A protein has these predicted regions:
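Primarily membrane-embedded glycan-assembly and transfer machineries that use lipid-linked glycans
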Residues: 1-106, 130-170
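Membrane-interface alpha helices of multi-pass inner-membrane proteins
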Residues: 104-128
Length: 170
């Protein structure tokens, strides 16, 4: 019930999700559920790669493991049930975490995730604990840049989110 669970994402998150408003509720929910399935498969493939699987093995196994994960693990079943963005945020963070430390774009995907929904910002600790300073700085810089750009374009919505909605426990 959308009245029970209000939308409290930063303006950038609203922008990213706004194309779903082009569809009726049922179609938008189905699109989100399909996206969650794809994102879960990507997450599984990235985990497989980080465990040393070949890309072929990772992508051959990922869809089947993703189905199992979505059916058995509560965070995934809840994401599907509510058509939430949690798996997208996890996929963005996993792209950075699983990338080689030498990749210069490492941190961008996590920074975008943190600009969409604040929770993924905790992923900066992964880079800090690994002493991957460039990735941590890239993540923070990406998130701040996107958030500040959002503020410039949507100052009223940004102020409402950061000074009101973000602090409202309901």
């Amino acid at each position: 019930d959308y009245k029970m669970y209000p939308f409290t994402y930063p303006p950038f998150g609203a922008w990213v999700l706004s194309p779903l408003t082009w569809f009726d509720y049922e179609t938008a929910a189905r699109l989100m559920i399909m996206a969650i399935a794809l994102q879960t498969a990507v997450i599984v493939a990235l985990i497989g790669r980080s465990l040393g699987w070949s890309w072929g093995s990772a992508f051959a196994i990922a869809p089947w493991v993703a189905i199992l994960v979505q059916q058995c693990l509560e965070p995934f079943t809840q994401s599907v049930g509510f058509a939430q963005v949690n798996t997208a945020m996890m996929a963005l963070v996993m792209i950075d975490v699983a990338a080689p430390p030498s990749w210069k774009g490492r941190g961008v995907a996590s920074g975008l995730a943190a600009a969409i929904k604040l929770t993924p910002a905790i992923a900066v600790l992964i880079f800090l604990l690994r002493r991957q300073w460039r990735s941590a700085i890239t993540m923070v810089a990406t998130s701040l840049t996107v958030t500040l750009l959002s503020w410039v374009i949507s100052p009223g919505e940004s102020a409402r989110f950061f000074f009101d909605a973000m602090w409202d426990p309901q």
